[in-house]
A protein has these predicted regions:
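Cytosolic juxtamembrane helix and N-cap/initiation of the first transmembrane helix
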Residues: 1-19
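Low-complexity, Ser/Thr/Pro-rich intrinsically disordered linker/stalk segments at domain junctions
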Residues: 3-6, 64, 105-112
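Hydrophobic/aromatic positions within or immediately flanking transmembrane alpha-helices
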Residues: 14, 74-77, 107
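Core segments of alpha-helical transmembrane spans in multipass integral membrane proteins
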Residues: 15-31, 39-68, 78-86, 115
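Alpha-helical transmembrane segments of polytopic membrane proteins
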Residues: 47-55, 91, 104-111
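Membrane-helix boundary connector in multi-pass membrane proteins
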Residues: 73, 86-106, 125
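Membrane-interfacial loop-to-transmembrane alpha-helix junctions, especially the N-terminal start
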Residues: 73-80, 129
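Membrane-water interface at the C-terminal end of transmembrane alpha helices
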Residues: 112-129
């Protein structure tokens, strides 16, 4: 039962990550400067694919976190927790150049959430016998 509780915690954190990224995008489209920048830059298929994968992975991980076996679950959550923490820190630093409180709050929360995913996976309890 203890293991299931850890799996659900991590799964909920991945869902939070996906919802926060959706919120970030919606709020970004409400900022005039962001919309103007988007019209000026060209977003190719590679960038669109990267963004889709960046959204898709947390949703897949929410499902895998409750279905994978313990060892695989622990390792994939540690690895992706670190990867997404680093990516979110990079994303946060980009927004610090032109800060808006709501974006800093949302992106900052994704840094904390992905760090917690790593932490929970690292502290995964021993299998009960």
């Amino acid at each position: 039962m203890e293991i299931l509780r850890w799996k659900i915690r991590i799964s909920v954190l991945w869902l939070f990550m996906a919802v926060a990224m959706s919120t970030h995008s919606v709020l970004a489209f409400m900022e005039r400067e962001v919309v103007e920048q988007m019209w000026e830059m060209e977003m190719g298929p590679g960038m669109m694919l990267f963004m889709a994968i960046f959204w898709w992975v947390p949703l897949v991980m929410a499902v895998l976190s409750v279905t994978l076996k313990d060892l695989a679950n622990r390792w994939i959550n540690m690895i992706l927790g670190i990867v997404f923490t680093v990516l979110n820190i990079f994303h946060l630093t980009e927004h610090l150049a032109h800060p808006s409180a709501h974006q800093i709050l949302i992106i900052g929360s994704t840094v904390v959430v992905t760090a917690l995913i790593f932490w929970y996976a690292l502290k995964w309890p021993k299998q009960e016998t």
